[in-house]
Amino acid sequence: MALTYRGNVGDLKYTVTGNIATNKNKVVDLAGSDDIISNGGDKIRFILREGEPIGSFYGYKTDGLYTQEEIDAGRFYTFGRIPNAGDIKYVPQREDVKYYGDLEANEDKSHAAISGEDRTIIGKDVPDFTYGVNLNLQWKNFELSVFGQGVSGTMTAFESEQISAFMLNANPREFHRGRWTQENPNPRAIYPRIYGGHSLDDYNQYFSDYQLFDSDYFRIKSISLGYMVPINVVKSWGLSSLKLFVTGENLFTLRADDKMKDFDPESPSGRGLSYLGSKSVAFGVNVSF
């Protein structure tokens, strides 16, 4: 849907155009097949499930990072091993899973274990809405044009930055300073406890909503300010017309998730190796003889 409104206030003329589109989809029939789980990268998982939208992320729900107090009190779940402070706190989806410290002495330790059965849909990478706005203002010899666009209702997963932020070609950015350490035992730290080695099977590397970013954004894609030199002045210079202008691209972006501040919200889910989108400013002159 698109709407345009034109008007003027004295010498000021304006045109405002807005558009919005929605994308609603769901898997209707898998022809008798079970859920289809696919690998979108090193660890990213997608699921096709009847009644759910295409592009649904499939993984573990989390609740921050474990504190040392929780570990000491036995208020944790195992996931292949006993976690340490600073490890991701995976949340079981099965009702019969207990805290490790609540198990009876002779009880099976698997009753406190997270497993693949605890995976669930944790988000999607297809936006609910895409929208844009275009503003044009004219006042005497000046003209201002602004174009912005954004999306709402979508998530992004960056494997390199969340799963292996300090290896290969990943961009560490704020992860080094904001990661969990014994000196910074923040249960909501941007990156969990770090372990040595080169294994992608580390406790903190299972695909989960801890690795998802809210990628809703609104970006000023372009802004242009122009000035048309008065015709009497131009003619005295032997010209037909002369316009001076300055144009900027990608100068300003609003993000729903502060964790996205070092990433380009227009990047798709995947490796996440690219740096922020470039900004540019250009000055120009249009001359007619």
Question: Language-model segments: which ranges?
Answer:
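Outer-membrane beta-barrel and related beta-rich outer-membrane complex signature
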Residues: 15, 25-42, 153-182, 254-262
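Residues that define the transmembrane beta-barrel architecture of outer-membrane proteins
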Residues: 12, 127-131, 216-221, 277-281
